[in-house]
Amino acid sequence: MERTIDPLTLPYRPCVGIVLINREGLIFAGQRIDSPVPAWQMPQGGIDEGEKPREAALRELWEETGIPAERVEFVAKAPDWVTYDLPPELLGRVWGGKYRGQRQKWFLYRYLGTDEEVGIGTDHAEFSCWRWIGAEEMVAAIVPFKRAVYEEVVATFRPHLA
């Protein structure tokens, strides 16, 4: 018998997102390694128990891009948390079925290194390739159920973006 999940009874997974910009204000976009179709996104991930959001952001950046904290400069933090809900076809299939979506705190960092220093082939690899893109292209490239979050994040950090 198939179990029906009521998303309203599930919490949001606490997460962080990182808008990483280069010197020109272009955004780091990674192609998800687990997607057979184009699915570009910015680095993001869960906040571990006892971890502060900013610590989680720097850890996730390292895990997903190989970029250490010393190679980025903090620029801004979004004032509010943003949420998204998983679409019905993913509900119960990701994160052990424990969450209805994510509640994210977003950070903007400027990358101080070179493209050659980016290393997406980490122990926690999430991207198969990466590139620098403009804000509108980033919003257009994200999966539809996360698009409203990306629109809000881009609007928040607009003065710093190309």
UniProtKB/Swiss-Prot annotation:
One annotated GO molecular function: guanosine-3',5'-bis(diphosphate) 3'-diphosphatase activity
PROSITE patterns recorded: NUDIX, NUDIX_BOX
Motif (Nudix box): 45-66
Keyword Metal-binding belongs to the record: no
UniProt cross-references to Gene3D superfamilies, sorted A to Z: Nucleoside Triphosphate Pyrophosphohydrolase
CDD domains reported for this sequence: NUDIX_Ap4A_hydrolase_plant_like (cd03671)
Enzyme class: hydrolase
Entry cofactors: a divalent metal cation
Coiled coil: none
EC code: 3.6.1.-
Keywords of this entry: Hydrolase
NCBIfam families: PRK00714.1-5 (NF001938)
UniProt similarity note: Belongs to the Nudix hydrolase family. RppH subfamily.
Name by which UniProt lists this protein: RNA pyrophosphohydrolase
Organism (species): Cereibacter sphaeroides (strain ATCC 17023 / DSM 158 / JCM 6121 / CCUG 31486 / LMG 2827 / NBRC 12203 / NCIMB 8253 / ATH 2.4.1.)
Taxonomic placement: Bacteria, Pseudomonadati, Pseudomonadota, Alphaproteobacteria, Rhodobacterales
Recorded name of the encoding gene: rppH
